[in-house]
Amino acid sequence: MLTRKQHELLMFIHERIKETGVSPSFDEMKEALDLASKSGIHRLITALEERGFLRRLPHRARALEVVRLPQQATAAAPPKGRAPFKPQLVEAGQAMPVAANDTRELPILGKIAAGTPIEAIQQERDRLPVPEAMLGAGEHFVLEIQGDSMINAGILDGDFVVIRRTDSANSGDIVVALVDGEEATLKRLRKKGASIALEAANPAYETRIFGPDRVAVQGRLVGLIRRYH
């Protein structure tokens, strides 16, 4: 039987590998479990290895393999605030499966990079009908995705993301982040002490870390619309 911390770490590693294709770093594991030092992570990993849940892959950095999960894992939630967010998707190939009065037209404010930041948010260029069920309180807008860095979160090049305007976000949220006041990008936000990490959902892209004064949250992802041409 696993301890609570062993179970939390195992599920965090499992979810991160499933989401990004690579195991988390020791710093990420330490932050996720709110431990004071990496030595605690080393002890937990060793215990999970001894119990046959984890395996270290030799001669590779950040190489952990989940061998098996505890029976209760399928019903257990990951550590608080660490669940990977998958946006609600509306596929608009022909007609949206909602009545016209159940939609709201939102402004499309341009393209945003799911890759290397390419441009700041622009002015309205068009409008897109979005199901009311996808929206909550507050102001919303739409951006078109350019790039593939968020594909493991289900966000593809050419998709339209629905954003709730806000200047704050929790660690783990997918956000529109404005870097240095001029470059906008869509990434998963992680808070690392006094720093902000912008994390891709594609192992081909590195996590970028900035001081808090360099990153401004412009909004949080709430939904996704995919068109087929």
Curated annotation (Swiss-Prot):
A molecular-function term among this protein's GO annotations: DNA binding
Catalytic activity of the protein: Hydrolysis of Ala-|-Gly bond in repressor LexA
Signal sequence bounds: none
EC identifiers of the protein: 3.4.21.88
Catalytic residues, chain numbering: S149 (for autocatalytic cleavage activity), K187 (for autocatalytic cleavage activity)
InterPro entries named in the record: LexA, LexA-like, LexA/Signal_pep-like_sf, LexA_DNA-bd_dom, LexA_repressor, Peptidase_S24_LexA, Peptidase_S24_S26A/B/C, WH-like_DNA-bd_sf
Disulfide pairings: none
Listed PANTHER family: LEXA REPRESSOR (PTHR33516), LEXA REPRESSOR-RELATED (PTHR33516:SF2)
Family: Belongs to the peptidase S24 family.
Its biological purpose: Represses a number of genes involved in the response to DNA damage (SOS response), including recA and lexA. In the presence of single-stranded DNA, RecA interacts with LexA causing an autocatalytic cleavage which disrupts the DNA-binding part of LexA, leading to derepression of the SOS regulon and eventually DNA repair.
Protein name listed in UniProt: LexA repressor
Annotated organism of origin: Phenylobacterium zucineum (strain HLK1)
